[in-house]
């Protein structure tokens, strides 16, 4: 499971021209589910996202997580994060989870985040929909996080 997090001043997601979720300061998470992912990966990545320290402390260093910063989380499903881009000029999606599994694990991730952060601080996109995501990136600060791999957090 992969998550691209971006520290934002605000973010929103719209479907068919209607805004379905909006957050103020916090994290926008684009979530990609891979074919071998399980509930364990969803919970692991959720804990990593919520505890990852990307907000400034009193000295201006990235040392505060979204929970302690009082921020919100907007979770948007994005299957293209599971693409295989290792060859050619066209991505392959054989590593992406089947829609049924991906939707279930997306829901599990959102439920875990809502339980840990509070439902009022978690917004969601719509699985399988053509979404328009708007954000004001703060920094910019963007990281790719992955479950199941030690040391897999990579600065973008």
From Swiss-Prot:
It catalyses: glycyl-tRNA(Ala) + H2O = tRNA(Ala) + glycine + H(+); a D-aminoacyl-tRNA + H2O = a tRNA + a D-alpha-amino acid + H(+). Its main location: cytoplasm. A motif (Gly-cisPro motif, important for rejection of L-amino acids) lies at residues 139-140. Keywords: Cytoplasm, Hydrolase, RNA-binding, tRNA-binding. One of its GO terms (cellular component) is cytoplasm. One of its GO terms (biological process) is D-amino acid catabolic process. It is found in: Cytoplasm. It comes from the Bacteria. GO terms for molecular function: D-tyrosyl-tRNA(Tyr) deacylase activity; Gly-tRNA(Ala) deacylase activity; Ser(Gly)-tRNA(Ala) hydrolase activity; tRNA binding. The keyword Transmembrane does not apply. The keyword Membrane does not apply. InterPro entries: Daa-tRNA_deacyls_DTD (IPR003732), DTD-like_sf (IPR023509). Pfam families: Tyr_Deacylase. Its EC number is 3.1.1.96. It is an enzyme of class 3 (hydrolase). An aminoacyl-tRNA editing enzyme that deacylates mischarged D-aminoacyl-tRNAs. Also deacylates mischarged glycyl-tRNA(Ala), protecting cells against glycine mischarging by AlaRS. Acts via tRNA-based rather than protein-based catalysis; rejects L-amino acids rather than detecting D-amino acids in the active site. By recycling D-aminoacyl-tRNA to D-amino acids and free tRNA molecules, this enzyme counteracts the toxicity associated with the formation of D-aminoacyl-tRNA entities in vivo and helps enforce protein L-homochirality. A Gly-cisPro motif from one monomer fits into the active site of the other monomer to allow specific chiral rejection of L-amino acids. Homodimer. HAMAP family: Deacylase_Dtd. Belongs to the DTD family. NCBIfam families: D-aminoacyl-tRNA deacylase. This is D-aminoacyl-tRNA deacylase. It comes from Marinobacter nauticus (strain ATCC 700491 / DSM 11845 / VT8) (Marinobacter aquaeolei). The gene is dtd.
